[in-house]
A protein has these predicted regions:
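Active-site glycine- and acidic-residue-rich loops that bind
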Residues: 163-167
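N-terminal capping/small domains of soluble enzymes
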Residues: 2-158
Length: 167
């Protein structure tokens, strides 16, 4: 029941935030850009962390673990290259991810592409998302230090790294 209520609440908030965002962007003549909505969502998740037991702590269903290349995942749901904020990654691990693959890391720090870089995509009544973020990141040296110090190891689940390069 908690899952259903949180799902309905999430959809309502997502709909409301994106529509208000688009309204203000239209009023001020700014290109449509979903990135402020994503930042709002991340900040909201982080700021209600005191409700973590109620909202975030989901028990991973029993007998749903999976083994891949001698690595044991507590769930077959794996977060792949979608966030780099440690607070947000911790929340997703609490919600039952079986493992995590960090965003692509490049040798040097990168800012990524200029905004707008996230937009809705609609094609023949199918909805999607255009993503042109452009691999922003802290660079490999800073990332390795972060990886050593991260508290994500406490979950004892596989952590992967996507490594990129320039041609």
């Amino acid at each position: 029941m908690r899952f259903i209520l949180l799902s309905i609440f999430y959809r309502f908030v997502r709909y409301t935030v994106t529509n208000y965002l688009y309204l203000f962007q239209n009023i001020f003549g700014v290109s449509k850009n979903l990135e402020p909505a994503v930042k709002f969502g991340d900040n909201s998740l982080s700021n209600i962390f005191f409700l973590k037991r109620l909202i975030y702590d989901f028990e991973t269903p029993k007998n749903k673990s999976i083994e891949i290349f001698n690595m044991q995942f507590s769930s077959c749901i794996i977060g792949s290259s979608f966030k780099s904020d440690p607070r947000i990654l911790d929340i997703w691990m609490r919600m039952g991810l079986g493992g995590l693959i960090f965003k692509t890391i490049m040798e040097k720090k990168r800012a990524g592409n200029l905004e707008p870089r996230l937009q809705d995509a609609n094609y023949e009544n199918l909805k999607g998302l255009y993503n042109s973020i452009g691999l922003p990141g802290m660079g490999i040296k800073k990332f390795l230090k972060y990886l050593e110090d991260t508290e994500l190891w406490k979950y004892k689940r596989p952590l992967g790294v996507s490594i990129g390069g320039d041609n």
